[in-house]
C-alpha cells in the first residue's frame, strides 16, 4: 500500500472515530444520567459565582423526594430551560432563585424539573 493511501486511510479512520465520539457521547451520557438533556451550557450570569456564563454542566435525573434546598436544578419554562438553585420546597411546587438575582423565580411545578 502506498504512503499516500495509508495517509488517506488514517485520515478517514480518524474522522470516523471523531464523528462517532461526537454523535454517541450525548446518547451515552443521557442513558447513564437518566435524562434526555445530559449537557447544558450556562447562557447568563444569573448563577454567578457558582456557574459562569459559558460553563458546561452535566444534568442528572433525580426523584422528587431527593430534591433539597440548595440544590441546583434545571427546569422547563416558556423561554426554554432555566438552571437555578432551590430556595423553598412546597408540597405542590418549588421556588428557585439565581444566585446573582435579587428576586425569587415564580413557582415551578415538580413535573417541570428535568
Regions found by a protein language model. Give the residues of each.
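Extracytoplasmic/periplasmic/luminal assembly and interaction segments
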Residues: 60-91
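Extended, hydrophilic extramembrane loops/domains of integral membrane proteins
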Residues: 83-114
